[in-house]
Amino acid sequence: MHKPILCVLALLCAAPAAAVNVPAELPPAVCNVLETCRMVGKGRLRWWGFHVYDAALWSRDGRWQADAPYVLDIVYARNVTTAQLAETSIDEIRRLGVSDATKLARWDAAMRNTFPDVQPGDRLIGIYRPQRGAQFYSATRLLGTIDDPEFARRFFSIWLDPRTQKPELRAALLGGNGRTD
């Protein structure tokens, strides 16, 4: 009776040690936007011990600057619907200080029109384009562009703002070596 419980505990404890699984390169169409692509850092998001996704942050020179173009590459480990992606993003943007209901509704609709449902192994790649907005790609194609600089800044702040809900993931993305679970 105790053996199954110990096995589950062992699996949950061993999971955080697993290597972050992000590709070593960005798709050429994405990298062309930056001209050169160097990884800044990478990390893993866990929620209640479950692996949700691995993420990598890329820039032109391997250093993140909030006012320069960069790429956030997410490789999902779970099924997530378009609605879940949009709702979670809006909840986080709201938590970080945006309360304008009209603006949030517009951004929610834009994400629902851009993001696909994702399955384990799928990539969702976002490009931050200062003063212009954001572009989103899968591993193989452009998904869409949201030409709203404020949306882009607020969306990527979910991961990169110092007030993020996952500071360990932020530290890892910015090149730190902290745990990300």
Regions found by a protein language model. Give the residues of each.
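N-terminal signal peptide c-region/cleavage motif recognized by signal peptidases
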Residues: 13-17
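Terminal leader/tail segments of proteins
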Residues: 19-181
